[in-house]
Amino acid sequence: MKRSILLLALLLCTTLSFAQKATYKVAQRDTCDLFMDVYEPVAIPGDTLDRPTILFVFGGGFVMGQRDDPWVLPWFKLLNENGYRVVSVDYRLGLKGVRMKFDLFHLLQSADLTKKAVDMGVEDVFASVRYLCDHAEELGVDPDNIVISGSSAGAMISLSSELEACNRTVRAEILPAGFHFAGVMSFAGAIMSDSGKPAYKRSPCPQLLIHGTADEAVQYEKMGFGRRGMFGSSYLVNNVLKPAGYTYQIYRYVGHTHDMAANMMANWPEEKRFLEEAVMGGNKLVIDCTIDDPTMPVLGFASVTLDDIY
């Protein structure tokens, strides 16, 4: 009941009028132009915190979605009202119009296609990051204080962006030397890999992972064959982040499915704590929390599966 009351209060207090929003063209691709929307924060009297810019990557299975999806705007407004600048970015939809099958005979092909779509998304997000860095002064952005966040496919791109930034891949060469994200907030995300278990060549930034334990769209654990696979939040914590002593906070919602990809408003207390303590405060506290909360809202697309999307 408490969480439902909190969500209702946030929605009632959050209108969709923004103090200031500006749109910028970031890059030109063969198939489309890429833009970003910048939502300016509300000035908080007496606030001395060095708040990061929140870069958001939308979801939609790499076949749909847009940077200003109506359902996510209340969350942007909530972040603005708490002093955070929000930058919502475009990326090309790498699986739009692609026929995907997930039976045994097509699993490897589908994994390769998904990895290609993630890579394309990372390339486009890095173009936006470069734009922010090159125009940091005029946009009021600190290049060393950017938290990347994403929902579903956007969370997959966000986690992969941090991995590639740490490993300085070819796609990451567009980033300024020494660039690093200040944090990652992943809502039902995973890392696609064609080279086995993900590994970081330098310590990653703090990561907030929110995932439903029964998610059938983006794996909570792992799905794959051989060195190809989708490595979900639980697998990444248990096999990558925890053994290496990296900083993470994971909230495992028992019985929830893919609805956790869009429950940012209900998870605001966890996000606020992560941003204030792990990102701004530098607290290396690790949180691994399994939550069975009947008051957590279940959204309309909770039962979505891969077959539903493709």
Predicted regions and their residues:
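Alpha/beta-hydrolase active-site loop
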Residues: 103-138
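Bacterial Sec-dependent N-terminal signal peptides
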Residues: 1-22
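The feature captures the conserved acid-bearing segment of alpha/beta-hydrolase catalytic domains
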Residues: 172-245
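Primarily recognizes the serine-hydrolase "nucleophile elbow" in alpha/beta-hydrolase
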Residues: 129-203
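Short beta-strand element of the alpha/beta-hydrolase
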Residues: 48-61
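Short amphipathic alpha-helix adjacent to the substrate-entry channel of hydrolases
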Residues: 67-89, 96-98
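C-terminal catalytic histidine-bearing segment of alpha/beta-hydrolase fold enzymes
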Residues: 239-310
